[in-house]
């Protein structure tokens, strides 16, 4: 018998047996490798997950810090702006009694007396100059009558019945008020109209 004609006891050629055994070994190895995951792969996956979480935490921290720095910068700018805007408040408060005194001097001065005319004119010019200067720095006078009572700028000291002025409107200003850049530094003392009973 030649080698090609040799048969195994099962009746299969030796090449067929080797091929079948090789296929069985490969299928067993692939089944085992599918069941057994390399522990290094698990460690790599765990480390990648931890790295991703750490990156996300760091990104959040950086974003929070940027937002906090932006808020701090904005608050600082606002504080500086307010400091510049209202730096004159103390000075203006000290100047108000002087302006009030000039106003009162004009009210009581006898304007018909020719001997006093020059003095009255001097007081008027001084008061006008002083008011012009303080207006340049954001000071506004609150002295309007027949306007609605505004508790932000008016302090009502009396209520008087009136037919000429609408109820809850300023009837008379007893003492002028002042604002500095929109902030009330002294409320105007006013008499308020009320409806006749």
Curated annotation (Swiss-Prot):
Organism: Cronobacter sakazakii (strain ATCC BAA-894)
Gene Ontology MF terms in the entry: adenyl-nucleotide exchange factor activity; protein homodimerization activity; protein-folding chaperone binding; unfolded protein binding
Phylogenetic lineage: Bacteria, Pseudomonadati, Pseudomonadota, Gammaproteobacteria, Enterobacterales
UniProt function note: Participates actively in the response to hyperosmotic and heat shock by preventing the aggregation of stress-denatured proteins, in association with DnaK and GrpE. It is the nucleotide exchange factor for DnaK and may function as a thermosensor. Unfolded proteins bind initially to DnaJ; upon interaction with the DnaJ-bound protein, DnaK hydrolyzes its bound ATP, resulting in the formation of a stable complex. GrpE releases ADP from DnaK; ATP binding to DnaK triggers the release of the substrate protein, thus completing the reaction cycle.
Compartment(s) where it occurs, according to its Swiss-Prot or TrEMBL record: Cytoplasm
Stated name of the protein: Protein GrpE
Presence of the UniProt keyword Chaperone in the record: yes
This protein's UniProt keywords: Chaperone, Cytoplasm, Stress response
Matches recorded under NCBIfam families: PRK10325.1, PRK14140.1, PRK14150.1
Similarity remark: Belongs to the GrpE family.
An individual GO BP term: protein folding
Assembly and binders: Homodimer.
Principal location class: cytoplasm
InterPro entries, per the entry: GrpE (IPR000740), GrpE_coiled_coil (IPR013805), GrpE_head (IPR009012)
CDD domains: GrpE
Region feature Disordered, mapped onto this chain: 1-43
PANTHER family to which the protein is assigned, alphabetical: GRPE PROTEIN (PTHR21237), GRPE PROTEIN HOMOLOG, MITOCHONDRIAL (PTHR21237:SF23)
Listed GO CC annotations: cytosol
């Amino acid at each position: 018998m030649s080698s090609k004609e040799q048969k195994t006891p099962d009746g299969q050629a030796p090449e067929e047996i080797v091929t079948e055994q090789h296929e069985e070994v490969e299928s067993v190895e692939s089944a085992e490798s599918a069941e057994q995951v390399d522990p290094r792969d698990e460690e790599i996956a765990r480390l990648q997950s931890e790295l991703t979480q750490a990156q996300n935490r760091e990104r959040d921290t950086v974003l929070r810090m940027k937002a906090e720095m932006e808020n701090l910068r904005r608050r600082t700018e606002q504080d500086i702006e307010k400091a510049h805007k209202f730096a004159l408040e103390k000075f203006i408060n000290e100047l108000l009694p002087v302006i009030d005194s000039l106003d009162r001097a004009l009210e009581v001065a006898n304007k018909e007396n020719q001997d006093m005319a020059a003095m009255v004119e001097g007081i008027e010019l001084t008061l006008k100059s002083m008011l012009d200067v303080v207006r340049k720095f954001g000071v506004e006078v609150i002295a309007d009558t027949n306007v609605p009572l505004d508790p932000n700028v008016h302090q009502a000291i009396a209520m008087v019945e009136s037919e000429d002025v609408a109820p809850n409107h300023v009837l008379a200003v007893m003492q002028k008020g002042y604002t500095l850049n929109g902030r009330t530094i002294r409320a105007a003392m006013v008499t308020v109209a009320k409806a006749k009973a």
